[in-house]
UniProtKB/Swiss-Prot annotation:
InterPro entries reported for this sequence: AAA+_ATPase, ATPase_F1/V1/A1_a/bsu_nucl-bd, CSD, NA-bd_OB-fold, P-loop_NTPase, Rho-like_N, Rho_factor_ATP-bd, Rho_N_sf
NCBIfam families noted in UniProt: PRK09376.1 (NF006886), rho (TIGR00767)
One GO molecular-function entry: ATP binding
Domain Rho RNA-BD span(s) in chain numbering: 51-125
HAMAP family xrefs: Rho
One Pfam family recorded for the sequence: Rho_RNA_bind
Subunit structure: Homohexamer. The homohexamer assembles into an open ring structure.
Protein name per its UniProtKB record: Transcription termination factor Rho
Length: 427
């Protein structure tokens, strides 16, 4: 019998893997990708030895040295798997690593499953995990690869973002949203665009302090990993889930992967920290402690493009005009930390104009690194022609609806400008 470990399986040709799949009686093996087939073989091999093959996201108990793999929603549950301190040290495992391996059921006096052997770390050979560079040691750069979000002609939100506030791999973006301005619909459109256009990227949707029915809606609408801590959970759980998601994203970036976190919302995460941290003795307007900003800023500031390969993109919503002074202070504190902002306009939403994007106030820093020069010239021309008329956004979107792609929209604008220049020259 051949050696059944992830390193040996990765070195096998597809024909050899198919032979093993037939040996283990795996159904539909020809329809699986190589990575899926490898994990199906590992699982079948474990079951043959009367063991389970399970995986989860590692959370290390710092004071004790051992840890638990969290298989469900990055949160503690009865399905957690115990992993010993010696295994953590041997493979240089870190918080947020997704660890897969053979697991035995709990004995009489035990509460948790026990991990017997580490088969894979973040989908790779565990030995290669030792050679990873730590996330803080990686070199951050400005985003220089555009993440194209345009998909279907009727998805105007993502088409407008590509034009007016382009998103790059490694972007740190704020979606500034008043209530009832279409924030949730926008997040779903962005998530589905990422899934369609960037299938290789790792997408995580993080929902903090949201309504349970909204979580269900997004889980059913989005193909990525949806992680949530609903408003009926304690603030400590919001913080633990958010920090483990960030650690998970960092570990993937260390493996040179492009990771995208869509977060709703940074405002509620900052509120949770304000309730949990020890008081510093100082209070800002709205009743928020200045010390409560440190860890949410660490979360948001982790977004970066990496010179050595990979990137972490964070698009987080910030709530404004909620009637709470604290929410406005939180937005003001985060306003200068991002390198892209997308503003939603409540007045447009009240007039039933969707997407309710404030085109004038939305934009990206260093957009010249993302957008081709000919598109950039057209974009600046559009910005120059923007009037203060409240009907401008409505006219702009009406014109967009008549075109199927952004390229077609730019071509029509070019023709209109040429005709306008000719008529002015004749005069």
């Amino acid at each position: 019998m051949k050696d059944v470990s992830i390193s040996s399986l990765e070195n096998m040709k597809l024909k050899e893997l198919y032979e093993l799949a037939r040996h283990y009686k795996i159904s539909y093996y020809s329809k699986l990708t190589k990575k899926e087939l490898i994990f199906a073989i590992l699982k079948a091999n474990a079951e043959q030895e009367d063991l389970l093959f399970m995986e989860g996201v590692l959370e290390i108990i710092q004071s004790e040295g051992f840890g638990f793999l969290r298989p469900i929603n990055y949160s503690p549950s009865s399905e957690d798997i115990y992993i010993s301190a010696s295994q953590i040290r041997r493979f240089d495992l870190r918080n947020g690593d997704k660890v897969s391996g053979k697991v035995r059921p709990p004995k009489e006096n035990e509460r948790y499953y026990g991990l017997l052997h580490v088969e894979a770390v973040n989908g790779d050979d565990p030995e290669s995990a030792k050679e990873r560079v730590h996330f803080p040691a990686l070199t951050p750069l400005y985003p220089d690869r555009q993440m194209v979000l345009e998909t279907k002609p009727n998805f105007l939100s993502t088409r407008i973002m590509d034009m007016m506030a382009p998103v790059g791999f490694g972007q740190r973006g704020l979606i500034v949203a008043p209530p009832k301005a279409g924030k949730t619909m926008l997040l779903k459109e962005i998530a589905n665009s990422i899934t369609a256009n960037q299938p290789e990227a790792e997408l995580i949707v993080l929902l903090i302090d949201e309504r349970p029915e909204e979580v269900t809606d997004i889980e059913r609408s989005v193909a990525g990993d949806v992680v949530s801590s609903t408003f009926d959970e304690v603030p400590e759980n919001h913080i633990k889930v958010a920090e483990l998601v960030l650690e998970r994203a960092m570990r993937l970036v260390e493996h040179k992967k492009d990771v995208i976190i869509l977060m709703d919302s940074i405002t509620r995460l900052a509120r949770a920290y304000n309730l949990v941290i020890p008081p510093s003795g100082r209070t800002l307007s709205g009743g928020i402690d200045p010390a409560a900003f440190h860890r949410p800023k660490r979360f948001f500031g982790a977004a970066r493009n990496i010179e050595e390969g990979g990137s972490l993109t964070i698009l987080a919503t910030a709530l404004v005009d909620t009637g709470s002074r604290m929410d406005d202070v939180i937005y003001e504190e985060f306003k200068g930390t991002g390198n892209m902002e997308l503003h939603l306009d409540r007045s447009l939403a009240e007039r039933r104009i969707f997407p309710a994007i404030d085109i004038r106030r939305s934009g990206t820093r260093k957009e010249e690194l993302l957008v081709p020069k000919e598109h950039l010239d057209r974009l600046w021309s559009i910005r120059k022609t923007m009037s203060d008329s409240p009907d401008f956004a409505e006219k702009f979107m009406r014109k967009m609806k008549k075109t199927k792609t952004n390229q077609e929209f730019f071509d029509i604008l070019n023709q209109e400008w040429k005709q306008a220049n000719l008529s002015s020259a004749r005069r």
